[in-house]
Amino acid sequence: MLVLKVLGMIWWLLVIPFGIGLLVAALTKKFRKNQEFQELPSMGAMLLGGYILMFALLELVGIPVMLFSVYHGFSNLYKIYAPLLILLAIAGIGLSVHWQIFQDIMAAQRFKYKESPFDRWEGWFFLFVFLLLVGVQLYMAFTRASFDGDDAYYGVQSLMAQQTDTLYRINPNNGRSTPLDARHALALFPIWEAFVGTMCGVHATIMAHSVVPLVLIPLSYLIYAEIAKIVFADRKALRPLFLVFMALWQMFGNVSIYTTETFFLTRTWQGKSFAGNFVLPAVLWLFLCLFYQEKKEKPLVLWLLLGALNLAAGASSSLAVLLSCMLTVGVGFLFMWKERRVQNLLLAGGSCVLGGLYVLLYLAL
């Protein structure tokens, strides 16, 4: 039974998002005929893209279900959401095989490995130090539990979705039925934890406290690894050192209960942590991908992914949508100034459309 649960977690937390990321890579390769195999995204970037689209789809499916389903909202959600995720992942894997994208991906990985910073012992040493630091963080996150009052709300909402088959229709403080909690209802991150737990046969609280940190902590570092590839493109030996610095920064950033570093390691399962440690760094990562594109015409898929990210931010927190859209427009203005192209600002604004609709719905509720 335990083996089946672990396999279920691997399926829903690794295979499905990676398959969705493959779909993005396959479509990009198909519609950019002159794309070289070296330009294909890395496997880590595809996994990140899959998670972005997975949370964006959660909002697209979950918000209407939540608004119109007073009873059986949770079961209605996973009956729609789960098949869509599986179809997208199968489509990504199938198209990659049909269009022979896998061969290009493996060729790109071999090419990038030859250009990696690990041709010297210093690179391997700092990589070992980084993995050791992350291992300590994962061990502490799995074996220790920090007290946090927000569990009385967010953790309970996740558990009530499993046990009562409703979405934000019960007050977690007294257990009574209540009108839709408009303040928190659009942020479906606790519901996602309940969804994955239900699909794997795991209690929502165990999923939130023991499993989610093992996924989101490495996922956040994966963003920094992708950022390092861009920022230190010509100084590859500094990439592992940058990751060591980020790991130490997270470990010693607990100067108050409000820092993103504190949320990152002690409240990983909460949407606010996901907003500060995944969504906002991912916005910067996507803009760095756009900034460092040598071709004048930027890949449209990056702008579409940015739009999906601004919607996915709503899964973590209603405020996160506003912050990510503000960051998108602000960096988009700098992007326009750098390249002297108004189109960049217009595309940045266009990527905020779904996020803007989210904010309008929040205000209407």
Residue ranges and their predicted role:
Residues 15-19, 82-87, 215, 219, ...:
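Membrane-embedded alpha-helical segments of multi-pass membrane proteins
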Residues 1-116, 355-365:
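Membrane-embedded, hydrophobic transmembrane alpha-helices
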Residues 280-301:
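Membrane-interface transmembrane helices that cradle and orient dolichyl/undecaprenyl
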Residues 301-318:
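Membrane-interface alpha helices of multi-pass inner-membrane proteins
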Residues 122-149, 248-252, 351-363:
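Transmembrane signal-anchor helices characteristic of membrane glycosylation enzymes that use polyprenol
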Residues 133-250, 259-269, 274, 278:
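Active-site lumenal/periplasmic loops and adjacent helix-entry segments of GT-C-fold
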Residues 324-349:
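Perimembrane helix-loop-helix junctions
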Residues 33-54, 122-123, 237-243, 298-303, ...:
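Membrane-interfacial loop-to-transmembrane alpha-helix junctions, especially the N-terminal start
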